[in-house]
């Protein structure tokens, strides 16, 4: 893969394959941090994909969409803004308030490492158009305004020094500095919010700038690719793959090409036959939302269940953190990362470097859910939704041995005609999902 050259056409680009590292890594950290982290407000409503888009945008739970929610001119975010800041206070007036005075990129990288993350994806430019990197093409960036720091550069260095791969998010289709008509529904994403020819050139240049300056392992585009420059997409991808031969891109450029599919909360269609990635926030927002206290975030059991179920079905989990404007990660988010990291440390061999098994995930009649992964010919079984105390379940058609990844877990097995009967006589809720393997 390293000696191959891509030549700016679709036939060449289509020869790129998903690198082993992305198949192996399983868990990454998404970061949404920007101007929107100052107001840090959105209503706590529903997950993406749960309701019709018109209803969703009216009460948008994404704090990073504050600009659009304000621009709509009604709804909870608009009301909050008028009451707290006044009708003459513009979104851009938040920029001097974003100081990132307590930001330590090395500390962030240490937290990600402890959490077990194998890659990180930073929002270098979200839909508001504010860039977290110095750019030849705009002064609207975090080096010349706000924090006065190259957030992308500093974090990339810290993350890589921690032995973690660095990826970059870029809002390819939407930039409210170029087209800022309010978005009321999904159709507006590709209609009233469609960019100009000037923006198509701008985004193409900035994408190449990010590739040249940071060589990201993941290029995570969002919403789409400007229709005014569709013919330039294979040139960009060729440039990226020539610069980063083992790089990967998601499915949000257009319908024609991707290395992996994406699912966001309940939105998106994926299957276990093709590599995919689940992304979601700790709560219902990606950007920090001061409305979301500890009780509004995903529980630790649900988080570990999400990771296991995703990995067992050929996915990676890209879990978002939403830092505060001062650069600190909220303690309730850090707490979840640490617990997840501790669980991954114990169950490491059943997650990283695995592939989905021929055995598909199954929900048993007793409410226990079984997930399967395989690695180097070994079978791994994860038992979820166990109850406190004694539990038992049957793995149909399997007649081998199993041992727990966690040596503190007592497991009894009996080979029966139907399969292996597994008993866990003393389950404790702090074990969360119990991992088993036939690797001796």
Language-model segments: residues:
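Mature catalytic domains of secreted/periplasmic carbohydrate-active enzymes
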Residues: 1-440
């Amino acid at each position: 893969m390293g000696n191959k050259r891509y030549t700016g056409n679709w036939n060449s680009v289509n020869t790129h394959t998903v690198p082993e590292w992305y198949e192996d890594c399983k868990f990454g950290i998404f970061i949404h941090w920007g101007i929107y982290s100052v107001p840090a407000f959105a209503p706590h409503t529903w997950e993406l994909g749960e309701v019709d888009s018109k209803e969703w945008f009216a009460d948008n739970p994404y704090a990073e969409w504050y600009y659009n929610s304000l621009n709509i001119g009604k709804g909870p975010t608009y009301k909050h803004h008028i009451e707290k800041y006044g009708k003459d206070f513009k979104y851009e007036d938040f920029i001097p308030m974003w100081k990132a005075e307590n930001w330590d990129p090395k500390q962030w990288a240490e937290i990600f490492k402890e959490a077990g993350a194998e890659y990180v994806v930073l929002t270098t430019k979200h839909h508001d158009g504010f860039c977290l990197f110095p750019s030849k093409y705009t002064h609207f960036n975090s080096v010349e305004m706000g924090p006065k720091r190259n957030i992308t550069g500093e974090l990339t260095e810290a993350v890589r020094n921690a032995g973690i791969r660095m990826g970059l998010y870029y809002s390819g289709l939407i930039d409210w500095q170029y087209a800022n008509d309010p978005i009321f529904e999904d159709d507006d994403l590709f209609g009233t919010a469609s960019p100009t020819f000037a923006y198509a050139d701008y985004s193409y240049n900035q994408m190449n700038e990010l590739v040249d300056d940071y060589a990201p392992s993941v290029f995570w585009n969002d919403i789409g690719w400007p229709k005014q420059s569709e013919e330039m997409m294979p040139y960009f991808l060729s440039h990226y793959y020539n610069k980063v031969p083992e790089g990967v891109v998601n499915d949000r450029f257009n319908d024609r090409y991707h290395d992996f599919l994406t699912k966001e909360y309940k939105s998106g269609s994926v299957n276990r036959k093709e590599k995919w990635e689940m992304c979601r926030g700790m709560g219902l927002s990606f950007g920090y939302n001061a409305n979301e206290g500890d009780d509004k975030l995903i529980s630790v059991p649900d988080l570990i269940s999400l990771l296991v179920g995703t990995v067992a079905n050929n996915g990676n989990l890209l879990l978002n953190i939403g830092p505060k404007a001062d650069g600190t990660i909220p303690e309730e988010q850090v707490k979840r990362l640490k617990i997840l990291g501790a669980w991954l440390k114990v169950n490491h061999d059943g997650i990283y470097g695995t592939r989905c098994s021929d055995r598909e995930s199954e929900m048993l009649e007793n409410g226990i859910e079984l997930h399967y992964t395989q690695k180097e010919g070994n079978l791994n079984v994860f038992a979820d939704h166990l109850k406190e105390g004694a539990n038992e379940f049957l793995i149909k058609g399997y007649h081998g041995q199993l041992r727990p990844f966690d040596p503190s877990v007592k497991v009894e097995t009996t080979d029966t005609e139907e399969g292996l009967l597994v008993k866990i006589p003393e389950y404790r809720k702090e074990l969360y999902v119990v991992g088993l393997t036939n690797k001796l």
